[in-house]
Amino acid sequence: MDKLSGSARLIIVSDLDHTMVDHHDEENLSLLRFGALWESVYCQDSLLVFSTGRSPTLYKELRKEKPMLTPDITIMSVGTEITYGEAMVPDDGWEEYLNNKWDRNVVVEETAKFSELKLQPETEQRPHKVSFFVDKKSAQEVIKSLSGNMEKCGLDVKIIYSGGQDLDILPQGAGKGQALAYLLKKLSSCGKPPNNTLVCGDSGNDAELFSIPGVHGVMVSNAQEELLQWYAENAKGNPKIIHATERCAAGIIEAIGHFKLGPSVSPRDVGFPYVKEDHIKPTDAVVKFYVLYEKWRRAEVPKSDSVVQYFKNITHANGVIIQPSGLECSLHASVDALSSCYGEKQGKKYRTWVDRLFVSQSGSDSWLVRFDLWEAEGDARLCCLTSLALNVKPETPAGFLITHVHKTWLKGYSSADEQSSKL
């Protein structure tokens, strides 16, 4: 949260499975479309929050499988854990707050009396969360009995049933909604209340998010019956909550446009040739650069000299690129080499995307842009920590020039093949 000097233009708080991440989309197109939009338009003045029922272990596994962005804040284990930044620094104040009227040992003892409850894997058992699988037919009766037993034991707990099988027992003060309320209060106390907040979900454990006063909300088109039922009973007619017509991350993009929260056209949906912008945004320039690079290698743009010429127009004739090995090459020579790799990834599950994009102004018309540049093909992943120097030049065809690129392998994601890191 410290990255912003003032109020966030927009906070997006999204569930992951079947909301931000579409497990039926093998190409991850909607997730990549959202990622390109966020890094292009919002990453410098807004906050991205992932709110998931997953434990830290399963959350990290998902990040290795899908082309997800690095969020500013991560809420995990159904709102019982809050962490900040890439390092996932825990919020100790939140953990201390959840200890009120909570005794995990008593919860375990009481739930052991119900044969209908099957413990979830050990990774999903957390300090402030005990999780089970339970058959849909038995769920409501078990919840009613459990609630009474916990009250008799002097505990104040919350029981959440979602996904038609998952039953989570948490402290009463926990949950996705309370975690978000805590964060919004924290931002307000620092004098940084967000201009707008958009919450996004698909299942029962997301319902609390939509109850926070003042937020906009989107139930993605594939939302489950339990969330739609909650909406019908509690929020029908609320103009700030919509049921999207698009699935998952595409539904989130739809909501940004519907509520007029900001630009809602992803760079991945912009055709080539690009229209010259009146005001150059370094973030937008970088994202579009690598989207076009991917489309060229996948043969999703025509094999035209105009594409190669565009890359030359936006790179300085004397500019250099330093590859991860330390090899220094001419930017224009690297662009020329693109001609030979047109369509080499056609029909393959090849994608490239940028993450953790950070911009600093180095002069009146010059910028230093730092980001993680990811490339994936099937299950194989590569990542370069990339620095790019960019000058705004209104008189040039594109309005800007890239003068220098420096790439270093991210530990654990390197390749011996320097060709894997052409631009």
Curated annotation (Swiss-Prot):
The keyword Magnesium applies. Keywords: Hydrolase, Magnesium. Homodimer. Its EC number is 3.1.3.24. Its cofactor is Mg(2+). It is an enzyme of class 3 (hydrolase). It catalyses: sucrose 6(F)-phosphate + H2O = sucrose + phosphate. This is Probable sucrose-phosphatase 1. Belongs to the sucrose phosphatase family. GO terms for biological process: sucrose biosynthetic process. SUPFAM superfamilies: HAD-like, NTF2-like. Pathway: Glycan biosynthesis; sucrose biosynthesis; sucrose from D-fructose 6-phosphate and UDP-alpha-D-glucose: step 2/2. One of its GO terms (molecular function) is magnesium ion binding. Catalyzes the final step of sucrose synthesis. The gene is SPP1.
